[in-house]
Structure formats: structure tokens, C-alpha cells
């Protein structure tokens, strides 16, 4: 039944306490613990749990078995040590007529029995078996009911990026272009592949069509100046035969991700698509706005109404002369976003309509503060590492297939000082949650110059980060699977050598072993 508290591993980071103090606290905790109503399943009840609300097809089992080969696979993928700390918790969500709160407090412990100490070479057959954690969630919709036929997207990229195992965006595109079951959600995609061969175009077309993506793949030519190529995508979208049935033409980067299409469409429906509209967002970094101008930063997604797209298409030649391209160079090479803004400003009365839930994410370093901020982003960008940050929003967003769009990045605070940022992390605060949860933790930096306040206008002033303080440790989501019964299993991992979880910068590690936490989201 896993390790009990007697092994002293109950959520205990290695702290420089004296043994006496430790024992006193330990005995106190043990005493209080015996008085609490237990959320632990008695061994006799370690059986499939039947929820009377469910009919036969949706019975969820609390599976407390440990599968050695699955642990070995995780060990391989994430270079885990042989001895790990492990815990699994089922989370039963209850859809209610409530708003999505910045923080949902749950009056239960997340891991009342701490973690099991497991040797992957010889694991126990079962893990500590707990009753599901019960959490309320708003009634939000799932991808299988999206009708996005109002939208036609345009992206330029290269065949080599599409086929790169590390950064290929195709499965992410399928998230926002299909119903999650291999069928188009109605949205179209015009994909331009730079310098691709006929075979590459055909292969891409076939592969993406197979995945249910309504795509038209075209070649484009690297000899055309990049900024001009970018601008020419809008007339190409405007020219598409499906235009008549669209309301918005959307340009974005190959690393733009739209987690929640219902929410995106709801927001867009607040605007009158028959008027001239240029909708997008600024960079979070005022430094970039000063450098490049007040315009839509394309990685967050830029939405054009058809009437405005028509005007840009008409003026394409005038807007893309050598002189205009030179004017779009702010010292970082000619920028497509600038060429587009100038074309709109110089030929129409339209300026940017700011949709702040879109995110360019010009941030570097540890992005946790953003993803743990309780936000409900309509787009995400720059999350593939390299010079920007690294995150896994595709894996994170899988949970919406079970509990609806609002669940992604929704926060739950449990009685034992954990905060689940659903689909990003499970963070534990050993000294309590004594900070302003409404502010974003400044774990990241602006680039290339961080004045300390560049990001404040868009993200709000951020609170001081808790790195190297011993006050925070987080397991981050690495994978997630929608399972046959409709539940979603998430795997969160904390490595012992993570540079962030130490006492003092470069100081002693808070934990001696790697940690794996699993959450399984089941419906009520
Ligand atoms: C069982 O539940 C599923 C999903 O809620 C529903 O589609 C199905 O009709 C239900 N079957 C019965 C027998 O109630
Ligand atoms: C354990 O997991 C593997 C996949 O890693 C799977 O093939 C196997 O069926 C699982 N075994 C049991 C008993 O569930
Ligand atoms: C759009 O169609 C017009 C008319 O058929 C054509 O002249 C123009 O080159 C096309 N533009 C693009 C970018 O495909």
C-alpha cells in the first residue's frame, strides 16, 4: 500500500530541521491525521468504484495498480532514477452552472498519504489508493461540438519543420482544426510550404487530409522577401474559393496554438464581421512595441474581416514595393507584421482591435508563472523552446476533451497547500500559500532587454518568484492521454536535479528522488 507516513516521506522536502523538531511535527501531524475523516480507501474497498449517476458505458474504475513497463517507459523518456516518489489521484469533476474562478479552493488534501517510494526495477503491485478528489468545474464545451467554419487560417512554414520530430506542429493544428476524432471542425487552412517539392506538397496534403484537416497545400518561394511573402498570404486567403462562407481570415505562425475554439469563436462573435476589422494583440513586452510599433504581433494570430482583407488584397502591390519593405525594417530585418500594419494604416482608417486573451508570449526562461496564472488564453505562441520558452500546451489541453475548455489551466488549491494548474503543473508550497495568487509569478524574463517592468502593462506587475526559496516545488505536465473510457490521464514530473527546486540558488536540492504524479480526470 505504498509507504506510509512512517517512512517520513509525507510531502517532506529535505529541510534543515533538527530531528527533534521534525519528530514533534510528525507526531502532531499523525495525531491530527487520525482525527480527520479519511479520504483513503480502505483496502477492502479497493475495487472498481461505481458512481450511481453513471450508466454502464461510463463507469470509471479507480485503478490503483502499478504497471512496471509503463514506469520503465517513463524512466526512459524522462531519464528518471530507479527510485522515485510516485502518487496517483483520480479527480472527479462536477459540471456546474458556475463561472470559471481564478482559483477554486478544494476542502480536501490532494495527497493525504504523501508519495509512494517506488523502485522501478521492482515496483509494488499497487499504489496508495485514494477516493477521487471532487472538484467543481464550469459547464464548458468540448472540441467535438465546435463549428469553426467561419474561419480560414493561413500559415507559411517549411517541410523540414513539419517533419521534425521535436517541433512538428501538425498534431497541434489538428487540435484546433478538427473535432478531436479525425474530422474537420469546419475551419480551413491554407498552408504554404517554402521551396517544397511536388512530392513534399502531395505527401503533406495527404497526411493532413487523413487527419481530418481541411487543408490546401501550396508551394511558395524563398526568393520572395519574407515580409512580402507574409503579406501575400492575406490576398491568397481572400482568393480562396471558400471565402464566401467565411467571416474571418486568420494569419498565424506555425507555432501558434489555439487551445479553446468555442471560446475563441464566442469572443470573435462579439464583433461585427461585416465591418473592417483587424483583430490581434500586442507583444507583452513594451520594448517590442517601441521597437516594432503598435500592431498585431502575428504569432498570437491576426484576424481580418473580409471587407478589410479585400482592401489589403487590392493594395497588395503598393504595399509591398521595395521601398515599403525597407520601411518595415526596424533593424531586425523587414518585418511582415510591420508591412501589414503600414498597409492597413496607410490605406484605411482601421487600427488594431486588441483581443488580450491572444498571446504572442515574447518571454524567455521558465514560463511557469504565465501558465500558472489562472488565465484562459485564446492563443499561445513561442512555446517550442529555442530562444523562447518551452511548454506543452497540446498535451495540457487534452484535458478539455473530458472536462471542457474552461478546465485547461484552471487552478485548484487543495487543503494541503498544492495548486493544480490543470494541464501545466502541480505545485506544492511547503511553507503555505502566502502570496498574492492573483498576480503572475515572475519566473520568466523579457528579451533581449529586461528592465523589470517591460511585461507589466500586458501581464500586470508580476510577483517575486519563488525559485530557490524552498517555498515552492512543481511537477510539470509531460504527457496526457484521452483514455478509452473518456477520462484523461495526466503525467506530471519533477526531476531531482531541476535547477529551480533548491535551497538558495545552486544550493541543496529540495528532493533526493525524481517524482511522478498522475492525475486521472473522470466525469461525475
Ligand atoms: C449512457 O451515457 C451515454 C453518455 O452520457 C449516453 O450517450 C447513453 O445514451 C447512455 N445510455 C443509457 C442506456 O442511458
Ligand atoms: C502495461 O502497459 C503496457 C504499455 O506500456 C501495456 O502494453 C500492458 O498491457 C500493460 N499491462 C497491464 C497489465 O495493464
Ligand atoms: C488572387 O486572384 C486574382 C484574380 O484571379 C489574381 O490576379 C491574384 O494574383 C491572386 N492573388 C493571389 C495572392 O493568389
Q: In which residue ranges do the predicted regions lie?
A:
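Extended non-globular C-terminal regions
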Residues: 2, 6-18, 416-524
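N-terminal signal-anchor transmembrane helix specifying type II single-pass membrane topology
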Residues: 2-97, 492, 497
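Conserved catalytic core of nucleotide-sugar-dependent glycosyltransferases
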Residues: 15, 256-347, 355-364, 373-375, ...
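Long, contiguous juxta-domain segments that are non-catalytic but functionally important
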Residues: 63-182
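Short, well-formed alpha-helical segments that are part of the catalytic scaffolds
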Residues: 131-141, 160-181, 200, 483-523
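Active-site-proximal specificity loops/subdomain of glycosyltransferases
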Residues: 190-248, 257-262
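Active-site acidic Asp-centered loop
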Residues: 252-254
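PAPS-dependent sulfotransferase catalytic core
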Residues: 350-402, 406
Amino acid at each position: 500500500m505504498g509507504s506510509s507516513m512512517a517512512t517520513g516521506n509525507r510531502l517532506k522536502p529535505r529541510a534543515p530541521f533538527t530531528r527533534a523538531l521534525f519528530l514533534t511535527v510528525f507526531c502532531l501531524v499523525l495525531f491530527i491525521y487520525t482525527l480527520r475523516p479519511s479520504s483513503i480507501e480502505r483496502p477492502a474497498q479497493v475495487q472498481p468504484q461505481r458512481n450511481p449517476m453513471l450508466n454502464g458505458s461510463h463507469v470509471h474504475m479507480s485503478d490503483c495498480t502499478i504497471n512496471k513497463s509503463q514506469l520503465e517507459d517513463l524512466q526512459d523518456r524522462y531519464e528518471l532514477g530507479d527510485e522515485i516518489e510516485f502518487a496517483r489521484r483520480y479527480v472527479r469533476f462536477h459540471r456546474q452552472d458556475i463561472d470559471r474562478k481564478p482559483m477554486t479552493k478544494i476542502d480536501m488534501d490532494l495527497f493525504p498519504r504523501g508519495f509512494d517510494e517506488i523502485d522501478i526495477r521492482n515496483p509494488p503491485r499497487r499504489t496508495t489508493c485514494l477516493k477521487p478528489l471532487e472538484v467543481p468545474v464550469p459547464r464548458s464545451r468540448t472540441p467535438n461540438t465546435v463549428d469553426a467554419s467561419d474561419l480560414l487560417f493561413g500559415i507559411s512554414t517549411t517541410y523540414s519543420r513539419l517533419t521534425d520530430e521535436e517541433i512538428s506542429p501538425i498534431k497541434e493544428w489538428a487540435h484546433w482544426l478538427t473535432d478531436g476524432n479525425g474530422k474537420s471542425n469546419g475551419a480551413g487552412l491554407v498552408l504554404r510550404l517554402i521551396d517544397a517539392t511536388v512530392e513534399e506538397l502531395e505527401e503533406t496534403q495527404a497526411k493532413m487530409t487523413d487527419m481530418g484537416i481541411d487543408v490546401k497545400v501550396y508551394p511558395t518561394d524563398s526568393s520572395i522577401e519574407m515580409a512580402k511573402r507574409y503579406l501575400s498570404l492575406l490576398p491568397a486567403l481572400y482568393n480562396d474559393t471558400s471565402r464566401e462562407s467565411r467571416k474571418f481570415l486568420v494569419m498565424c505562425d506555425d507555432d501558434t496554438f489555439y487551445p479553446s475554439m468555442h471560446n475563441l469563436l464566442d469572443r470573435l462573435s462579439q464583433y461585427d464581421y461585416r465591418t473592417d476589422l483587424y483583430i490581434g494583440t500586442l507583444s507583452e513586452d513594451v520594448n517590442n512595441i517601441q521597437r516594432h510599433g503598435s500592431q498585431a504581433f502575428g504569432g498570437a494570430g491576426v484576424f481580418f474581416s473580409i471587407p478589410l482583407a479585400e482592401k489589403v488584397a487590392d493594395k497588395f502591390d503598393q504595399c509591398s514595393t521595395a521601398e515599403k519593405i525597407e520601411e518595415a525594417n526596424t533593424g531586425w530585418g523587414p518585418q511582415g507584421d510591420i508591412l501589414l500594419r503600414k498597409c492597413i494604416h496607410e490605406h484605411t482608417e482601421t487600427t488594431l482591435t486588441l483581443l488580450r486573451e491572444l498571446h504572442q508570449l515574447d518571454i524567455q526562461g521558465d514560463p511557469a508563472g504565465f501558465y500558472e496564472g489562472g488565465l484562459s488564453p485564446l492563443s499561445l505562441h513561442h512555446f517550442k523552446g529555442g530562444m523562447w520558452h518551452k511548454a506543452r500546451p497540446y498535451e495540457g489541453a487534452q484535458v478539455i476533451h473530458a472536462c471542457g475548455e474552461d478546465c485547461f489551466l484552471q487552478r485548484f488549491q487543495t487543503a494541503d497547500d498544492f495548486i493544480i494548474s490543470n494541464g501545466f503543473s502541480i505545485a506544492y508550497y511547503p511553507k503555505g500559500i502566502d502570496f498574492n495568487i492573483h498576480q503572475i509569478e515572475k519566473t520568466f524574463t523579457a528579451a533581449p532587454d529586461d528592465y523589470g517592468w517591460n511585461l507589466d502593462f500586458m501581464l500586470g506587475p508580476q510577483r517575486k518568484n519563488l525559485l530557490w526559496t524552498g517555498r515552492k516545488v512543481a511537477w510539470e505536465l509531460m504527457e496526457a492521454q484521452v483514455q478509452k473510457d473518456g477520462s484523461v490521464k495526466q503525467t506530471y514530473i519533477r526531476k531531482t536535479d531541476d535547477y529551480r527546486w533548491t535551497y538558495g540558488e545552486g544550493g541543496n536540492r529540495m528532493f533526493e528522488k525524481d517524482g511522478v504524479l498522475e492525475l486521472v480526470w473522470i466525469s461525475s
